[in-house]
A protein has these predicted regions:
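Short, low-complexity disordered leader/linker segments with a strong preference
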Residues: 1-46, 71-72, 77, 120-127, ...
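Hydrophobic alpha-helical segments within soluble ligand-binding/sensing domains
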Residues: 47, 90, 148-176, 221-223, ...
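Hinge/cleft segment of the Venus flytrap/periplasmic-binding protein
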Residues: 43-45, 181-186, 200-202, 296, ...
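Flexible loop/hinge segments that line or gate small-molecule binding clefts
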Residues: 117-154, 178, 278-284
C-alpha cells in the first residue's frame, strides 16, 4: 500500500517536470497522458498467492476463484505459485513475494505447522498475509492478518450427525455401522477437522471404526487404500471419504470388487460419504453413488478481496472469516441436522435433497 502511494508521488513529480520543461501545448498534453497513466498504474494492487497444489477438483475451483477475482480487469496483478504439495516450495514462494514487494500475500498452506519463520519475515516487511482454506498453527497469531476458509470441524460434525439421523431413519442399529475413514493429507486443516468430526460421532453413537488411512485427497490413492481395506475387512458398509476425489477412487474400488455402492446398507450396499460438493461429486450424489456430500465451498476469492478492500480503506478485519456451506444428500431421509461449529456455537443445518435443477445451478 505504501509502495503504491510513493510510486504515484514520484510519477506526479516527473509529470510536473515535463510540463515546466516543455512549455508547449503539445508537451502539456503528453504530460497529462503520462500523469493519467501513472494514476491508473498506482491503483493496481499486487497479490502473491501460494497455492498448495492442484491435487483435487476442489483445489482447481479454489485456484480459479482466486484468478478470476484478482484479475487485471479488477485492478490486480496476481502472482500465482503452485507449490505442488510441498511446504518448502511455499516458503520459497513467500520469500520471493517479499523480495518482489507485493502488497498482499495469500497462502493456502499444505499443512498447519512450520510457518513461524517465513511469516515473521513477511510481518517484518509490513506485508499483510491472508491465510486461505487450511489454517496455520503459529506461536503468535499476529504473524498473519486474517484467515478465509471453511469450518472443517463443523463439516465433520455435520457428516456424523447426518449419518446418525440416516441410520435411525432407516432402522439401522449404531452397532451395525462398520466404517473406514479415508483421510485427507495428514496434518491439513481439512483432515484434522473431518477426522475429528467422525471420531466424535464414533464415541457418541457407538459405531465401529474399523480403520483410518490417508488417501492424500487424490482419486488414485483413495482407490488404492479402499482396495486394500476391502481385502482386510469383509464387513465394511460405510466408506467415509474426506474429499470427493477420494470418493471417486473408493467407488471405483468398491465396484471393481464386485460390490454395490449405495445407501441401502441393510441389503448389502456400501455407503460412500464425502466432502467438497464439486460438480462431479454432486453428480455422483444425484446418481446415488455418494449418499451424502458435505459442502466445502472453494470460492474464497471474493471474500479475500472483500478483506483486502477493507484493509485498503484502513478498516479492521475479523481474524476468522468462514464461507457459507450446505449439506447435500441423495434422498430426503434426513431433513436437517444440529451441529456445533469450531466456535462452540450450535445451530440447525438443512439437508438439501439433490435434484438435476439444483446441480445445473451450481457454480462449481
Amino acid at each position: 500500500m505504501k509502495k503504491r502511494v510513493l510510486a504515484a508521488l514520484m510519477c506526479a513529480a516527473m509529470a510536473m517536470t515535463l510540463v515546466v520543461g516543455c512549455g508547449s501545448k503539445g508537451g502539456s498534453d503528453d504530460a497529462s497522458k503520462d500523469d493519467a497513466a501513472a494514476d491508473s498504474g498506482s491503483d493496481v494492487i499486487t497479490v502473491g498467492f501460494s497455492q498448495v497444489g492442484a491435487e483435487s477438483d476442489w483445489r482447481t475451483a479454489n485456484s480459479e476463484s482466486m484468478k478470476s477475482t484478482f484479475s487485471k480487469e479488477n485492478g490486480y496483478d496476481l502472482i500465482f505459485d503452485d507449490a505442488q504439495q510441498k511446504q518448502e516450495n511455499q516458503i520459497t514462494a513467500i520469500r520471493n513475494f517479499i523480495q518482489q514487494e507485493v502488497d498482499y500475500i495469500l497462502l493456502a498452506p499444505v499443512t498447519e505447522t512450520g510457518w513461524d519463520t517465513v511469516l515473521q519475515e513477511a510481518k517484518d516487511a509490513d506485508i499483510p498475509v491472508i491465510i486461505i482454506d487450511r489454517m496455520v498453527d503459529v506461536s503468535d497469531d499476529s504473524l498473519y492478518t486474517t484467515w478465509v476458509g471453511t469450518d472443517a470441524l463443523l463439516e465433520g460434525r455435520k457428516a456424523s450427525e447426518w449419518l446418525n439421523a440416516y441410520a435411525e431413519g432407516k432402522g439401522i442399529k449404531a452397532a451395525d455401522l462398520n466404517i473406514v475413514d479415508i483421510q485427507g493429507t495428514i496434518g491439513s486443516t481439512a483432515q484434522i477437522g473431518r477426522t475429528q468430526g467422525l471420531e466424535e460421532g464414533v464415541d457418541k453413537y457407538g459405531w465401529n471404526l474399523l480403520a483410518q488411512q490417508t488417501g492424500e485427497f487424490t482419486q488414485a490413492k483413495g482407490q488404492e487404500v479402499t482396495e486394500s481395506l476391502l481385502k482386510q475387512y469383509d464387513n465394511i458398509n460405510v466408506v467415509y471419504c474426506e474429499n470427493d476425489n477420494e470418493a471417486f477412487g473408493a467407488i471405483d474400488a468398491i465396484e471393481a470388487a464386485g460390490k454395490k455402492v449405495g445407501g441401502d446398507i441393510a441389503n448389502g450396499e456400501i455407503m460412500v460419504m464425502s466432502f467438497d460438493t464439486t460438480k462431479a461429486g454432486l453428480t455422483d450424489t444425484l446418481d446415488g453413488k455418494i449418499t451424502c456430500d458435505v459442502e466445502c465451498n472453494p470460492l474464497h476469492g471474493p471474500r479475500a478481496e472483500e478483506l483486502i478492500k477493507k484493509m485498503e480503506a484502513g478498516e479492521d478485519v475479523e481474524k476468522l472469516n468462514y464461507v457459507d456451506e450446505e449439506i447435500f444428500a441423495h434422498d430426503d431421509t434426513v431433513k436437517s441436522v444440529t451441529a456445533v461449529n469450531s466456535l462452540d456455537k450450535e445451530a440447525d443445518y438443512d439437508v438439501t435433497t439433490l435434484t438435476q435443477e439444483i446441480l445445473d445451478q451450481r457454480a462449481y
